[in-house]
A protein has these predicted regions:
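Active-site Tyr-X1-5-Lys
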Residues: 1-21
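Alpha-helical substrate-binding/gating segment
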Residues: 9, 41-54, 60-97, 103-111
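Beta-sheet entry/capping signal
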Residues: 14-19, 23-25, 84-88, 170
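Flexible glycine/proline-rich, aromatic-decorated loop/lid segments
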Residues: 19-22, 34-49
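Conserved sequence/active-site signature of Rossmann-fold short-chain dehydrogenase/reductase
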Residues: 25-27, 94
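Short glycine/proline-rich turn/loop motifs
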Residues: 48-56, 143-146, 163-165
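Terminal hydrophobic/aromatic helix or amphipathic segment near a protein terminus
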Residues: 99-153, 172-175, 189-202, 229
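Amphipathic terminal alpha-helices
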Residues: 156-230
Length: 230
C-alpha cells in the first residue's frame, strides 16, 4: 500500500509509472524451481505431515514466476502502461484454481492424506503442534488457525489492462504443473517422496494416481528459501 502511494505521487509529479499487482507468485512453470519458505508450500508440507487436507473451495490466484516476469517486462516497456495505471496479474478464471485443487494434487500424486472439514483440520493441527513444533505450519500458526476459509477469500480482479498489453493469459495450474512443483520440492528435500502405493486405490479422485516427474535437470540445485527455517 505504501509503495503504491509512492508510485501515485510520482505520477502526480510527472513521472511515467504504473502499478503491477501479481497474485501468489510460485515457481518456474518448466523447472518447478520455487521458494520453499512460502505460505503455499508450507501449507502443502504441513498437510502432508498432518496427513490431512482441509476442504477449502476459495479461489487461489497462483501465477508461475516466469509468466509474472514476462508480464512485468512487457508492461514496463509499453508506452501506454502509465496511462492504464493498474495491472493485475491473475490465474485464468476459466478454469479457475482453488485451494481444494491444490490439496487434491497431493492425493493425485500418492501422498497419504485424507480430506477433512476445516474445523477438524484446524483442531488436529492445534493438537499436533502442542505435542511437537516441527510442523511446517508452526511459524504461520496464528494465520492458519484464524478462520482460513474467510481470510483466504479473494476478490475478483479485472485483468483487462494486462490482457490488452501482454496479449497472453497465465498458464493454467493443472495436475501436470503441480507435479512439476511437487517434483522439485521432493528433489531438493523440502518434501518427502510419496510412499509406494497401489495405483488402483486412491480416495475421491477416480482411482488414478500419478508418478511425480523426475526433475533430472535439477541435479545439484540448492533449495531456495528466504530464511534458515525448514
Amino acid at each position: 500500500w505504501v509503495a503504491e502511494k509512492l508510485i501515485m505521487e510520482a505520477k502526480k509529479r510527472g513521472l511515467n509509472a504504473c502499478i503491477v499487482r501479481p497474485g501468489y507468485i510460485v515457481g518456474d512453470s518448466k523447472t518447478g524451481v520455487t521458494n520453499t519458505d512460502d505460505f503455499i508450500w508450507r501449507l502443502i508440507k504441513g498437510c502432508i505431515q498432518l496427513h490431512l487436507i482441509p476442504t477449502i473451495y476459495n479461489t487461489l490466484n497462483m501465477c508461475p514466476v516466469d509468466y509474472v516476469a514476462h508480464c512485468i517486462t512487457v508492461i514496463s516497456l509499453s508506452s501506454v502502461a502509465s496511462d492504464r495505471g493498474v495491472f493485475h496479474i491473475t490465474h485464468p478464471k476459466n478454469p479457475s484454481f482453488r485451494f481444494i485443487d491444490l490439496f487434491n494434487s497431493l492425493i493425485l500424486y500418492g501422498y497419504n492424506v485424507t480430506k477433512a472439514e476445516y474445523v477438524i483440520w484446524r483442531n488436529e493441527l492445534m493438537e499436533f503442534t502442542l505435542q511437537q513444533e516441527d510442523n511446517a505450519l508452526y511459524p504461520l500458526l496464528h494465520f492458519v488457525l484464524d478462520d482460513l476459509p474467510t481470510t483466504t477469500k479473494a476478490p475478483e480482479l479485472d485483468y483487462k489492462n494486462t490482457s490488452d498489453i501482454v496479449g497472453q493469459e497465465c498458464m493454467v495450474i493443472d495436475e501436470k504443473l503441480m507435479g512439476i512443483y511437487l517434483g522439485y520440492l521432493v528433489k531438493v528435500g523440502f518434501l518427502d517422496k510419496p510412499e509406494p502405493h497401489d495405483k488402483g486405490k486412491v480416495g475421491g479422485l477416480e482411482g488414478k494416481i500419478l508418478d511425480l516427474p523426475d526433475i533430472a535437470a535439477l541435479e545439484g540445485v540448492e533449495i531456495l528459501k528466504r530464511s534458515g527455517r525448514n
